[in-house]
């Protein structure tokens, strides 16, 4: 399950955590800690004849209580050890290097060599191939391949360039080729790598609101049991005198009873559950800025998902040329290829390839043609080519319609029918026009990912609503939404529309999760309850989000929700088990403990425990051992299942509630039998 080194370190750390200062952080286990000290003191008082407490029995209770505290410390230390192991590999990437600070951005030779730790926000640095990027920053000039394996674990280099949504670079990563001019956006101690190390080490982990609320409940229960246990000494003393039988309960038994009844199981494992949840997220290559974000992921009931890359494969391909009447398919293909020759997008290249495959169109001499390429812009929403008094454009239907009309041409109704047909089938239509005459439509096919419909069905079973966000027209969006099985969609989405959609759902009481990578996504990311920024995205997007996906995979959002729900399920399941345990231990111990005073209670000794001493020892041994048994479950988490919340609650109540009631009866009886056979009691 874990490396031997982590086990060894956890054993050492669990002993160090016996410090009173550290024990104060966990009030429930502090009760056990104080009980262990008192039992140890009573043993020595009995040993020297100062007290009437049985020295051998008291020593056994004291040792078991100390082991209970150590087991709780061990659970937390194991979880922290896994984080430290991950942090150690990250620390290897964080080292002080010499940076070339530019005095003048236009003169790459005028540099000052400065330690990376001395860089300040706004400094401009020049980084060459095979050099480490000294600090987090934004690329303002150049384009290069960057090895980010130290951060993401992915060996394939990625492109980082100025402008667009791939301009953010991380300190500690290495340039594989070319050069970059970077504006520093973080100082030493506040970099992305520093935040990662702090999070995985748990140094900056704060208790979440749910965790605090649960701890308040556990402390309240502990105080109630403490009050009840404290009254037992005078009560049993009075009762034994009145009954003329039995004797008052000993202080050792009061301590042992209190520990058995207090919610020590969940109290011991609560911290490790939270740390392990954060660790599982880190293993998925996601950095959460707080535990609150992970909990929110578990409560999310609305997911906003980008169509491209999440629902569809993201690389639309040209599949057909659909000419209008009077135009041949080859004529349309020829014009479409010419308009796409300088288009470096996947869609543009697929148009060129389709024309070659269908009609063997190739080998053009653009110099002889005096060709001038027209790039795509967000304003015109078209691209094309001008050559020898010919003008070809391709683009969105409404953009081409406006272009044709503005130049005195006629946009054929037949083209509208073709566009509607393509959009209705879930494709993207691009209209081609030559010399102000519409030639036809290129059918770009968007392929829905395999298995995505089943995943959305699982989410629906859990009560999570999925909404597809796309820039496509409503007809295309509706067709893809129907094929993918999402609940709703937002077509022709703008940053303002996304922000308003999130606010609308939040006003209705929903928790919303979304992903984003661009500066234009920042307002919506800042508004969302769970906001996952892509590592390849801009600095603004990363700062707006409360999580960063190092793999920059939009589908990761679904996995993040699963991890969040698993964390909440694990905490809830083990809390249920712990409380059920306490009820079972109460009914197992109390009758045996007091039937000396009240013989009628003998009828309630259903397990036939040998004696009060045996009952207490058996219960307190079980109380300690169950912590060790449940450590793997607290670290791994309760198995996640896609089903409605009501069914999930019923299932967990059956397994962990009923199981928590039955397990102590069986285990305590077996331990009692073992102690009797060994002659210990």
Swiss-Prot record:
The system is composed of three essential subunits: KdpA, KdpB and KdpC. The chain crosses the membrane at residues 30-50, 59-79, 216-236, 255-275, 587-607, 615-635, 661-681. The gene is kdpB. This is Potassium-transporting ATPase ATP-binding subunit. The active site is at residue 306. Mg(2+) binds at residues 517, 521. Its main location: membrane. It is a multi-pass membrane protein. It catalyses: K(+)(out) + ATP + H2O = K(+)(in) + ADP + phosphate + H(+). It is found in: Cell membrane. HAMAP family: KdpB. Belongs to the cation transport ATPase (P-type) (TC 3.A.3) family. Type IA subfamily. ATP binds at residues 343, 347, 376-383, 394.
């Amino acid at each position: 399950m874990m490396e031997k080194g982590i086990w060894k370190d956890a054993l050492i750390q669990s002993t160090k955590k016996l410090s009173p200062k550290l024990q104060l952080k966990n009030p429930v286990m502090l009760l056990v800690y104080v009980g262990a000290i008192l039992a140890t003191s009573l043993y020595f008082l009995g040993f020297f004849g100062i007290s009437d407490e049985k020295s051998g029995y008291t020593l056994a209770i004291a040792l078991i209580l100390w082991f209970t505290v150590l087991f709780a410390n061990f659970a937390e230390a194991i979880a922290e050890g896994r984080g430290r192991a991950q942090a150690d590999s990250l620390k290897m990437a964080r080292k002080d290097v010499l940076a070339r600070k530019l005095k003048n951005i236009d003169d790459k030779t005028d540099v000052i060599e400065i330690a990376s730790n001395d860089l300040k926000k706004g400094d401009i640095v020049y980084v060459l191939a095979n050099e480490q990027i000294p600090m987090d920053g934004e690329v303002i000039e150049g384009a290069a391949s960057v090895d980010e394996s130290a951060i993401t674990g992915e060996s394939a280099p990625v492109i980082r360039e100025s402008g667009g949504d791939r301009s953010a670079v991380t300190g500690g990563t290495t340039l594989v080729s070319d050069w970059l001019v970077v504006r520093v956006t973080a100082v030493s101690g506040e970099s992305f790598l520093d935040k990662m190390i702090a999070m995985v080490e748990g140094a900056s982990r704060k208790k979440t609101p749910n965790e605090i609320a649960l701890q308040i409940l556990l402390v309240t229960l502990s105080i109630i049991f403490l009050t009840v246990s404290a009254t037992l000494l005078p009560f049993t003393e009075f009762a034994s005198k009145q009954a003329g039988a039995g004797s008052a309960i000993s202080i050792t038994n009061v301590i042992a009873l209190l520990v058995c009844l207090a919610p020590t199981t969940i109290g011991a494992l609560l911290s490790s559950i939270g740390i392990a949840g954060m660790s599982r997220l880190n293993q998925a290559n996601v950095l959460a800025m707080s535990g609150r974000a992970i909990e929110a992921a578990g409560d999310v009931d609305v997911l906003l998902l980008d169509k491209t890359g999440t629902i569809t494969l993201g690389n639309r391909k040209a599949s057909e040329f659909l000419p209008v009447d009077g135009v041949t398919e080859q004529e349309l293909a020829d014009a479409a290829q010419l308009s796409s020759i300088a288009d470096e997008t996947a869609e543009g290249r697929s148009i060129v390839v389709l024309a070659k495959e269908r009609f063997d169109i190739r080998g053009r001499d653009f110099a002889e043609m005096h060709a001038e390429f027209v790039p795509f812009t967000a304003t015109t929403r078209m691209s094309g080519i001008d050559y020898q008094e010919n003008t070809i454009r391709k683009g969105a239907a409404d953009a081409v319609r406006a272009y044709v009309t503005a130049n005195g041409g006629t946009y054929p109704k037949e083209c509208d029918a073709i566009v509607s047909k393509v959009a209705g089938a879930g494709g993207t239509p691009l209209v081609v026009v030559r010399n102000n005459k519409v030639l036809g439509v290129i059918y770009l096919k968007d392929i829905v990912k395999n298995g995505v419909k089943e995943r959305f069905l699982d989410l629906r079973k859990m009560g999570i609503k999925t909404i597809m966000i796309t820039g496509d027209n409503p007809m295309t969006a509706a067709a893809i939404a129907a094929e993918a099985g999402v609940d709703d969609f937002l077509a022709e989405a703008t940053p303002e529309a996304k922000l308003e959609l999130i606010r609308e759902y939040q006003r209705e009481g929903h928790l919303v999760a979304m992903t984003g990578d661009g500066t234009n996504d920042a307002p919506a990311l800042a508004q969302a309850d769970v906001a996952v920024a892509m590592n390849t995205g801009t600095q603004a997007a990363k700062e707006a989000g409360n999580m960063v996906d190092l793999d920059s995979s939009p589908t990761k959002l679904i996995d993040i929700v699963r991890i969040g729900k698993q964390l909440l399920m694990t905490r809830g399941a083990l809390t249920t088990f712990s409380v059920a345990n306490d009820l079972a231990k109460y009914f197992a111990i109390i009758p045996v403990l007091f039937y000396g005073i009240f013989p009628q209670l003998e009828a309630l000794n259903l397990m036939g425990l040998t004696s009060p001493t045996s009952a207490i020892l058996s219960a307190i041994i079980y109380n300690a051992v169950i912590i060790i048994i449940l450590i793997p479950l607290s670290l791994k988490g309760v198995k996640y299942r896609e089903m409605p919340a009501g069914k999930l609650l019923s299932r967990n109540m059956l397994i962990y509630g009923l199981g928590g009631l039955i397990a102590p009866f069986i285990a305590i009886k077996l331990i009692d039998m073992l102690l009797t056979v060994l002659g210990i009691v």
